[in-house]
């Protein structure tokens, strides 16, 4: 897990709010599945978290209910402000119901080795990004967040996006007018925030075991969207390879090189645009 989390940290300012977001994470999840098979003896496939199924009560999801077959549940309750402000707007929603260390399920009392970078922002690479800072795995499950922003209606809005530019905007920015104007809280971010704490760390979220299920769902949505118009959508690209195009960088093309550090050899965008070409051989159910 540390190798994957460190890789995510290293490329955070390239792989979010950019033209390589979908493609980079597609191969990242595939690498995780391969690693589970080659190093851990896993014989199954990479599951995805269908956000809509748990949107109304995330704590009851078999993924997050704290049972022996879950990915652990909520963190222990801690004192928190009762409402969360969705900055930079004045909109508030109730906060989560946990917030502390996870002490239930298979990942109870798990120690994370990389630092908490949740306050680092997205302007500069944090100088302490790879410091050894052991701390507990935390969650703050929030059904108010999930029901408002990761429902089936939100998934349908993504799948009905008319272009790759619209799909990118719809997954990153909410449909709520004030939030969309602020360019925040699309289903991708909202799912992170509905789990909270470790998963809500922009840089180190892969330290939450559910990260790969979440991004398999992101990949599933992209794949299903592509399948609705494969002739035009399989190769559809938009954007650059830097977050919010900071600093300014060239538009991505099918020849743009993607890198994952020591986890993988580099790939071109062309090699990761389809789940059924080059080194990929999988598909998602509708």
UniProtKB/Swiss-Prot annotation:
Signal peptide: none annotated. Binds 2 copper ions per subunit. Keywords: Copper, Metal-binding, Monooxygenase, Oxidoreductase. Pfam families: Tyrosinase. It comes from Aspergillus hancockii. Its cofactor is Cu(2+). The lineage of its organism: Eukaryota, Fungi, Dikarya, Ascomycota, Pezizomycotina. Oxidase; part of the gene cluster that mediates the biosynthesis of hancockiamides, an unusual new family of N-cinnamoylated piperazines. The NRPS hkm10 and the NmrA-like reductase hkm9 are proposed to convert two molecules of L-Phe to the intermediary piperazine called xenocockiamide A. Xenocockiamide A is then converted to hancockiamide D via a series of hydroxylations and O-methylations. Cu cation A binds at residues 16, 25. InterPro entries: Di-copper_centre_dom_sf (IPR008922), Tyrosinase/Hemocyanin (IPR050316), Tyrosinase_Cu-bd (IPR002227). The keyword Cell membrane does not apply. Its EC number is 1.14.-.-. Hancockiamide D displays potent cytotoxic activity against murine myeloma NS-1 cells, suggesting a potential antitumour application. More interestingly, hancockiamide C, the likely end metabolite of the hkm pathway, shows potent Arabidopsis thaliana seed anti-germination activity, but is inactive against the monocot Eragrostis tef seed, suggesting that it could be a herbicidal lead targeting monocots. The herbicidal activity of hancockiamide C could be due to its phenylpropanoid-like structural features, which may act on the plant lignan pathways, and hence warrants further investigations. Cu cation B binds at residue 215. Pathway: Secondary metabolite biosynthesis. Belongs to the tyrosinase family. GO terms for molecular function: metal ion binding; monooxygenase activity. This is Oxidase hkm6. Transmembrane segments: none annotated. PANTHER family: N-ACETYL-6-HYDROXYTRYPTOPHAN OXIDASE IVOB-RELATED, TYROSINASE FAMILY MEMBER.
């Amino acid at each position: 897990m540390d190798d994957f989390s460190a890789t995510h940290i290293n490329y955070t300012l390239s792989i979010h709010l950019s033209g390589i977001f979908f493609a980079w994470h597609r191969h990242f999840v595939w690498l995780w599945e391969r690693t589970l098979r080659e190093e851990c003896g896993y014989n199954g496939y990479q599951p995805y978290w269908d956000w809509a199924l748990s949107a109304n009560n995330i704590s009851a999801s078999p993924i997050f209910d704290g049972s022996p077959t879950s990915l652990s549940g909520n963190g222990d309750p801690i004192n928190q402000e009762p409402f969360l402000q969705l900055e930079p707007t004045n909109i508030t929603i109730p906060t989560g119901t946990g917030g502390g260390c996870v002490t239930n399920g298979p990942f109870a009392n798990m120690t994370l080795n990389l630092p908490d970078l949740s306050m680092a922002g997205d302007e500069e690479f944090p100088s302490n990004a790879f410091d050894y800072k052991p701390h507990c795995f935390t969650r703050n499950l929030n059904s108010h967040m999930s029901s408002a922003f990761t429902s089936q209606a939100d998934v349908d809005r993504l799948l009905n996006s008319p272009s790759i530019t619209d799909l990118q905007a719809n997954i990153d920015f909410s449909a709520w007018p004030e939030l969309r104007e602020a360019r925040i809280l699309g289903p991708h971010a909202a799912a992170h925030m509905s789990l909270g704490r470790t998963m809500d760390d922009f840089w180190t979220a892969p330290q939450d075991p559910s990260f790969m299920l979440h991004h398999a769902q992101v990949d599933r949505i992209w794949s299903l969207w592509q399948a609705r118009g494969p002739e035009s959508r399989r190769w559809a690209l938009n954007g650059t390879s830097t977050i919010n195009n900071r600093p300014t960088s060239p538009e991505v093309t099918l020849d743009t090189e993607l890198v994952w550090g020591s986890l993988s050899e580099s790939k071109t965008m062309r090699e990761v645009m389809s789940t059924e070409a080059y080194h990929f051989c999988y598909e998602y159910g509708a």
